[in-house]
């Protein structure tokens, strides 16, 4: 019997439930089974998020990269990759990811905020202030 996209969606939902209950290995199995049926950015995003939760940052980046390959216009994927790169102190790469998330979704206040924090950390006060001002503007609206 050939598995369908519906089966893949069910496996992803099961994987998400496994994550909620801390059954990470089983979640990975479900995501991998789903990926054998159909490769989607969403599945790679979920798998990447799980790797972040378990502090497997390089694996998370690989999943986000694959998700970006499949859907380069998803701002959440770029944002999540930026967060991981921040965690492993690859600040310039993280800023590039936040920039891409902002390019795709100009009102993405979390991306603006994280970019501002990194710019501040790098001593780029003027650029950081511009980003913080954008966050304030977005939060007011």
Regions found by a protein language model. Name each.
Residues 8, 41-43, 75-76, 109-110:
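Helix-start (N-cap) detector for alpha-helical repeat units in TPR-like alpha-solenoids
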Residues 5, 38-39, 72, 106, ...:
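Short coil turns that delineate tetratricopeptide repeat
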Residues 20, 53-54, 87-88, 121:
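Register position in tetratricopeptide repeats
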Residues 2, 33-36, 65-69, 99-103, ...:
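Conserved structural position within tetratricopeptide repeats
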């Amino acid at each position: 019997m050939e598995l369908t996209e519906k089966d893949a969606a069910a496996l992803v939902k099961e994987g998400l439930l496994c994550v909620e209950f801390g059954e990470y290995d089983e979640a990975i199995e479900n995501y991998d089974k789903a990926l054998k049926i159909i490769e989607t950015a969403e599945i790679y995003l979920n798998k990447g998020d799980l790797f972040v939760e378990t502090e497997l940052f390089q694996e998370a980046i690989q999943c986000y990269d694959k998700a970006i390959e499949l859907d380069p216009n998803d701002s959440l994927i770029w944002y999540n990759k930026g967060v991981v790169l921040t965690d492993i102190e690859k600040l310039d790469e993280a800023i590039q990811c936040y920039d891409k998330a902002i390019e795709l979704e100009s009102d993405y206040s979390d991306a603006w905020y994280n970019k501002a924090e990194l710019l501040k950390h790098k001593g780029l006060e003027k650029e950081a202030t511009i980003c913080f001002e954008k966050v304030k503007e977005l939060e007011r609206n």
